[in-house]
Each structure stands twice: as C-alpha cells, then as structure tokens.
Swiss-Prot record:
Annotated region described as Antiparallel alpha-helical coiled coil region, given as residue ranges: 74-106
Gene Ontology molecular function: any one: ATPase inhibitor activity
Protein name according to UniProt: ATPase inhibitor, mitochondrial
Gene: ATP5IF1
Location of region: Disordered: 26-51
Keywords: Coiled coil, Mitochondrion, Phosphoprotein, Transit peptide
Gene source species: Homo sapiens
GO biological process, one term: reactive oxygen species metabolic process
Task of the protein: Endogenous F(1)F(o)-ATPase inhibitor limiting ATP depletion when the mitochondrial membrane potential falls below a threshold and the F(1)F(o)-ATP synthase starts hydrolyzing ATP to pump protons out of the mitochondrial matrix. Required to avoid the consumption of cellular ATP when the F(1)F(o)-ATP synthase enzyme acts as an ATP hydrolase. Indirectly acts as a regulator of heme synthesis in erythroid tissues: regulates heme synthesis by modulating the mitochondrial pH and redox potential, allowing FECH to efficiently catalyze the incorporation of iron into protoporphyrin IX to produce heme.
Sequence similarity: Belongs to the ATPase inhibitor family.
Classification via Gene3D superfamilies: Single helix bin (1.20.5.500)
InterPro entries, alphabetized: ATPase_inhibitor_mt
Modification type N6-succinyllysine: residues: 103
Location(s) in or outside the cell: Mitochondrion
C-alpha cells in the first residue's frame, strides 16, 4: 500500500509540475503578445537594418512581379479585343453581302 501511495504522489507530482509548466508557458505567451516577428527590427543594430533591407527588397520584388503580371494581363486583353473586333467586322461584312444578295435577287 505504501508503494501505491508513493506512486500516486509521484504521479500527481509529475502532473502537477506539468500543469504549472503549461500555465507558466501560457502566461509567458500572453504577456509577450505585442512582441512578434518584428522584434529583431525593433532591436535596431546591424540585424535590424539588414532585416529592414530584406523586407524592402522582398516587397519591391513582389511589386515588380505584380506589375509585370498586370501588364501581361492587359496586353492579353488588348489582343483578345482586337481579335473580337476583327471577327465582328467580318460578320458585318458577311451580313452586308447577304443584304446585297437579297437586293440583287429582287
């Protein structure tokens, strides 16, 4: 029976420690909510400047890619609309020819 009580105390002790650790980690995280990925930049120094330069380079590259994609999209739209204009002009000519043929038959 003494062994069982000792085992129970040990088991509860381990879980008690685990519970306290979990609570401790949880409170640490909630206290540091305002700190985030930008903490290196906020610290300043060489690492902060490097991080800022890398972020700016990344966003400039993203902007270039977006502008290139937008330009390509607009160029494709222009080509599509030109083809549509040509198709409609051919259809107009075809209808004019039909009208001409109908007038000729009268």
């Amino acid at each position: 029976m003494a062994v069982t009580a000792l085992a129970a105390r040990t088991w509860l002790g381990v879980w008690g420690v685990r519970t306290m650790q979990a609570r401790g980690f949880g409170s640490d995280q909630s206290e540091n909510v305002d700190r985030g990925a930008g903490s290196i930049r906020e610290a300043g120094g060489a690492f902060g400047k490097r991080e800022q330069a890398e972020e700016e380079r990344y966003f400039r590259a993203q902007s270039r890619e977006q502008l290139a994609a937008l330009k390509k999209h607009h160029e494709e739209e222009i080509v599509h609309h030109k083809k549509e204009i040509e198709r409609l002009q051919k259809e107009i000519e075809r209808h004019k020819q039909k009208i001409k043929m109908l007038k000729h038959d009268d």
